[in-house]
């Protein structure tokens, strides 16, 4: 199987100009994580693999999985929970990046929730004693969570944004909402931390005499590496090599590079294949859940100017011109070539499944971090 994504990010519209320039679209969204390339490149690879299977009369099956709402919606988790990936032996994925690599990577698990406080509105000056501020509930919760940071595992990450806080200073707000993310490499720690965040919310509601409700929005497992498949991808990526810019692309890249804040890579790194190593990313992805069920491996290709951060206007810009397309084409070629090796050497599947079984342990039973809730089709609406 090959995973594809296609969702954009709100507030990051951008033309393909090397200078910050908002695109005129209806919702202000932009492909700052390159999922337009991800989805198209994966579909392209699936078509090429199918063609190869037919032409060579090789027995096998290829499935392209279009997966929605990776950016906070955990689309793959619902698919995994409902058995959409059953009968798949190996799963490939890839992701746009500013470098070319096929590392054996882990990630943070995460879980999110929206916490809503309801109070009593009143005139903030003439009758404040008659009101109960929902915003006070949010702020009290945030204060307790911020104090909690001293007493959580070092690798944890907790972020929040206040999505509703009232409309006028002279009105005691009767509705307020805060949106929380909790992350850690261990999904069980994430589960525990989220429960502590809920307790902080409950305490805040009690202390401010407001009413609390909350909704789990999403939850992802950490990435489970599989060296058996990952090393195959690395060998194929190394065989194809990196990205070569034309003179026009080089000039464009130089202009983009000048706008980057403390870039970690240099111009020219797009030509390189990064050495194979174990790595950890502190972000999260719903590919994680898939990787605990099926041997899963992926690559990153330089669809952006070296040093570009994901979720930036620079990523949107490069992803909308030939640099992005070159990275996408490289990914499609690598996935296709790697798949043919597996069809020709089915013992890879046996080894990959044995590795996965040893990593997850014999007692592992999959339970989605987001529970049994239905997909939040409006999760971007605040």
Where are these regions (language model features)?
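N-terminal beta-rich core of secreted/periplasmic extracellular enzymes
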Residues: 1-20
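Active-site alpha-helical elements of protease catalytic centers
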Residues: 31-49
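Non-cysteine beta-strand/loop elements that form the S-adenosyl-L-methionine
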Residues: 3, 118, 299-302
